């Protein structure tokens, strides 16, 4: 189209140039024909010129339209490119939204199932708890009724077991007492033999005056008969004290068993409170040591409200008397006949410590060790005879000394 417009312009310009240069020729024809041809040419020229102007206007309008269409085309292409990217993003977002919705529905279903299971389990646990509470109440009532029935009717089996245990203890004590009596009789015969075969008492007194604890072992002159008699006297005194203490302990146990038997026979429908209290009160009066078991009663009060204590005077070193065999045996028989039953307390020797495991446990004399010297044999170490109290003083202290309550 542009080429056509340019051709028209070139034609017009060429005509204008020829018009300037051309010289109006003289028509060869006569006047009318030349005028008519000239007029036809002028009209044709005017017509061509008008059409050329119209074509130029149309050409400019078409150019503007082409430019607008080109701009639209470029915009459409850009829109297509952007729209393709947006569609992909929209598709992705839609797929993600769809997956999220599916997951939400699945989670809702799972939550409903879990809530349903929890409600069922809670219901079952509540039912089990109620049943357990009912069982617990039943067991409590049964236990309370059994306790009431036991308090009203105590079982006889416990009394029988206690009775059997007490009988066994009494039997064991009787056996121990028999063995100790036998040993005491054997020791008595040995003591008589030792007195008959031993040296006279004057030599013993001389030995007591000569021997002193402050002297060394090399200065002591050992005397076989003197050591033997001193050992026999010491063993005699220990056995006598052990026998008297065991006698008192057996009396206390017999008294307690008598109380238990009488209370069990009379009061079968009530709890044995008094007997147990008596047993505990009497058991607190038993002082058990490593070798002896002494019984201690509270002494009767004097008119001024104080308990008497007969403290014997300590023996002086000069109060040394000679006892013959007859006097020693007579003191043994007198003390056996005059065993105090009114609560006399027998003092323990200072060398025996209180090493019992419990306060109310029985502790009998421990058997002699292999390292110790056998009974009746001479000891290598000389005993300080001046520190040993005389027999009449020990007997008096054994019978008359009472502790304060």
UniProtKB/Swiss-Prot annotation:
| Record InterPro entries | TBD, TBK1-IKBKE_adapters
Coiled-coil ranges per the record?
Answer: 40-197
Per UniProt, subcellular location reads as: Cytoplasm
Instruction: Name the reported effect of residue 238 to A.
Output: No effect on interaction with TBK1 and IKBKE
Report if keyword Hydrolase is assigned: no
* A Pfam short name: TBD
Instruction: Name the Gene Ontology biological process terms.
Output: dendritic cell differentiation; dendritic cell proliferation; mitotic cell cycle; negative regulation of canonical NF-kappaB signal transduction; T cell activation
UniProt's post-translational modification comment states: Ubiquitinated via 'Lys-48'-linked polyubiquitination by TRIM38, leading to its degradation.
Q: Which residues carry this modification: Phosphoserine?
A: 331, 366
**Chain segments carrying region Homodimerization:** 1-198
Q: Name one GO cellular component term.
A: cytoplasm
Keyword field: Coiled coil, Cytoplasm, Phosphoprotein, Ubl conjugation
Region labeled Disordered — which residues?
A: 357-377
Top-rank taxon of the source lineage equals Eukaryota
Q: In which tissues is it expressed?
A: Testis, ovary, heart, lung, kidney and brain. Expressed mainly in the spermatocytes or spermatids in the testis.
Region listing for Interaction with TBK1 and IKBKE, in residue ranges: 229-270
Q: In which broad location class does this protein mainly occur, judging by the first location in its UniProt entry?
A: cytoplasm
Specify the inducers.
By 5-azacytidine.
- Biological function: Adapter protein which binds TBK1 and IKBKE playing a role in antiviral innate immunity. Activates serine/threonine-protein kinase TBK1 and facilitates its oligomerization. Enhances the phosphorylation of NF-kappa-B p65 subunit RELA by TBK1. Promotes TBK1-induced as well as TNF-alpha or PMA-induced activation of NF-kappa-B. Participates in IFNB promoter activation via TICAM1.
Assembly with partners or alone = Homodimer. Interacts with IKBKE and TBK1. Interacts with TICAM1. Interacts with TAX1BP1. Interacts with CALCOCO2.
What is the name of this protein?
A: 5-azacytidine-induced protein 2
Q: Which species is this record about?
A: Mus musculus
């Amino acid at each position: 189209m542009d080429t056509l417009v340019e051709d028209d312009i070139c034609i017009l310009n060429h005509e204008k140039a020829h018009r300037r240069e051309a010289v109006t020729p003289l028509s060869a024809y006569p006047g009318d024909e030349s005028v008519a041809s000239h007029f036809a040419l002028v009209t044709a020229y005017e017509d061509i010129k008008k059409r050329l102007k119209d074509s130029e206007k149309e050409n400019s309008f078409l150019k503007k339209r082409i430019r607008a269409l080109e701009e639209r085309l470029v915009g459409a292409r850009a829109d297509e490119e952007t729209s393709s990217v947006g569609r992909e993003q929209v598709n992705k977002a839609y797929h993600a939204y769809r997956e999220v919705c599916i997951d939400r529905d699945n989670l809702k279903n799972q939550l409903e199932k879990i809530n349903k299971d929890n409600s069922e389990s809670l219901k079952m646990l509540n039912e089990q708890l109620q049943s357990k509470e009912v069982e617990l109440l039943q067991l409590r009532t049964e236990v309370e009724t059994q306790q009431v029935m036991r308090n009203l009717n105590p079982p006889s089996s416990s009394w029988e077991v206690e009775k059997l245990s007490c009988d066994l203890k009494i039997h064991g004590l009787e056996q121990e007492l028999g063995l100790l009596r036998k040993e005491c009789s054997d020791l008595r015969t040995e003591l008589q033999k030792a007195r008959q075969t031993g040296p006279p008492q004057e030599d013993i007194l001389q030995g007591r005056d000569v021997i002193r604890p402050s002297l060394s072992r090399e200065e002591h002159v050992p005397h076989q008969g003197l050591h033997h008699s001193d050992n026999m006297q010491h063993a005699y005194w220990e056995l006598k004290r052990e026998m008297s203490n065991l006698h008192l302990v057996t009396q206390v146990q017999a008294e307690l068993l008598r109380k238990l038997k009488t209370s069990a026979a009379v009061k079968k429908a009530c709890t044995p409170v008094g007997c147990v209290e008596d047993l505990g009160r009497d058991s607190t009066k038993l002082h058990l040591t490593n070798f002896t078991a002494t019984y201690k009663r509270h002494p009767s009060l004097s008119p001024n409200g104080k308990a008497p204590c007969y403290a014997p005077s300590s023996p002086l070193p000069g109060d040394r008397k000679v006892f013959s065999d007859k006097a020693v045996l007579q003191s043994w028989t007198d003390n056996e006949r005059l065993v105090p039953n009114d609560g006399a307390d027998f003092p323990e020797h200072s060398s025996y410590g209180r090493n019992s495991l419990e306060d109310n446990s029985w502790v009998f004399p421990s058997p002699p060790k292999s390292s110790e010297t056998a009974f009746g044999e001479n000891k290598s170490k000389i005993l300080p005879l001046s520190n040993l109290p005389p027999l009449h003083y020990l007997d008096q202290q054994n019978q008359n000394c009472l502790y304060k309550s």
